[in-house]
């Protein structure tokens, strides 16, 4: 199942996995009409203020991938959930509970970007990747351009003493350990994409 998040609404392609959307596939004649229709639909969906979940079925991954590339500028990112003693590291970015993440630089792998961004945003070093988590996809308007951000997520551990230092120039004001007593407030306050996609993983991490 492939989901795109925008503010408080979700677009769902239940029969498609995100890895099927890679460019380079051959476009069939039947896909051409779907691509045009999907581009129109995506534009209307972005303008719609109704906070609902919308399902799109019986469309080929090729058509979906091409429509997304025509509608959005792709902006890959990576981040991580740092685990320590049954808790995880959360941040407050511009007043919103969040997880450390950032853009993938040219020539950088998602894994390297996750390690770099988490250390930059939290001040926590000696990070190691334990496993990959599901990616999140969300879109936003930057200037006059719609961007679609895929964020690669990883569970991270560290041998470093947890002496966090928030990256204030990125709007981060707090870096905290989140445990059982704080997780409900974190998930309620964070972005819909994190709550829906990573929420179950977070609850496993802190053993709820």
Where are these regions (language model features)?
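Extended, hydrophobic interaction surfaces within ordered domains
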Residues: 5-53
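Active-site beta-strand termini and strand-to-loop segments that position acidic
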Residues: 82-85, 156-158
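Short hydrophobic/aromatic beta-strand or adjacent loop that forms the aromatic wall/cage
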Residues: 1, 77, 149-153
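Nudix hydrolase/Nudix homology domain
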Residues: 2-4, 15-28, 96, 167-208
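Conserved Nudix-box catalytic region and its N-terminal flanking loop in Nudix hydrolases
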Residues: 21, 27-28, 83-119, 124
């Amino acid at each position: 199942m492939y989901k795109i998040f925008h503010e408080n609404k979700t677009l769902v392609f239940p029969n498609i996995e995100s890895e099927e959307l890679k460019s380079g596939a051959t476009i069939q004649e039947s896909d051409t009409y779907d691509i045009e229709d999907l581009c129109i639909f995506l534009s209307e969906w972005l303008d719609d203020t109704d906070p609902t979940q919308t399902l799109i079925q019986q469309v080929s991954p090729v058509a979906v991938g091409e429509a997304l590339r025509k509608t959005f500028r792709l902006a890959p990112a990576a981040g991580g959930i740092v685990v320590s003693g049954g808790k995880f590291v959360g941040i407050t970015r511009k007043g919103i509970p969040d997880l450390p993440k950032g853009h993938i630089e040219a020539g950088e792998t998602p894994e390297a970007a996750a390690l770099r961004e988490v250390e930059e945003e939290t001040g926590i070093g000696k990070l190691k990747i334990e496993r990959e988590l599901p990616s999140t996809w969300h879109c936003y308007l930057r200037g006059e351009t719609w961007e679609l951000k895929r964020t690669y997520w990883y569970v991270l551990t560290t041998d470093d003493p947890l002496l966090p230092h928030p990256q204030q120039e990125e709007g981060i004001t707090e870096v905290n350990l989140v445990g059982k007593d704080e997780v409900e407030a974190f998930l309620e306050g964070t972005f819909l994409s994190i709550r829906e996609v990573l929420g179950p993983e977070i609850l496993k991490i802190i053993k709820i």
